[in-house]
Structures are given as C-alpha cells and as structure tokens.
C-alpha cells in the first residue's frame, strides 16, 4: 500500500512538472512604476507566450516585477536569451544571448543587486570571441 502511494505521488509530480506554464494574459504595464498588472493588481505568477503555436517566452513575475528565470525564443524555437531577475526586478547572475542559429552571442554577468559585473564576452556569428568588457 505504501509503495502505491509513493508511486502515485511520483507520477503526479512528473506530469505536473512537465506541463506547460499558463499562457500570459493581456497585461497592463505601468511605465512610470515599471509594474506589470492584471485587473489593476500587480501580477504574480509564471506564464508563457506563444505565437502561431510556437513558444516565444517563459516569464515570471512577483508583485508586478520581472522575477525568476526568463527565457526568450526565436521563431525557429532556438533560445534567444535566458537569465534571471531578483525580487526587485533587476537582472542577476549570468545572462546568455544567442544568435538564431544557436551560436552564443553574448555572456553578461550581474551582481545580486542587479549591477553589471565581471567580464562580459561578445561573440560573432561564427562563435569567435570578438570583445571583452570588464565591469570589475
């Protein structure tokens, strides 16, 4: 009996973790306060945007601010940009940018406070390193 409960619980978690996030509703964006709202309330949640059935972005918000992991996709399904935001809506950690063929374009780093930091790397379309920008 205990085995069945564990098995059912594991199956449930596998299916729910593989499901698509909710579709993003039509948000309002307050440009003065830089807050995303839904029905005049700051939005909190994870959602995704699709165009012509193809995923274009996965986004998260916390109290109307960009939050957590964000991923943007090209029309061909390849990743365009991926990175994270802190609870204040500022970019943090490593942000990666890619060309539409999947080759890396840029690697940027941000501190926990959202400040540019470290060595940023820029690549050409062939994947060759063409520029280094030092934010230390």
Place the predicted regions along the sequence by residue.
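Glycine/tyrosine- and acidic-biased, solvent-exposed loop/turn segments at the edges of beta-strands
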Residues: 16-136
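N-terminal secretory signal peptides that target proteins for export/translocation
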Residues: 1-2
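Sec-dependent N-terminal signal peptides
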Residues: 5-15
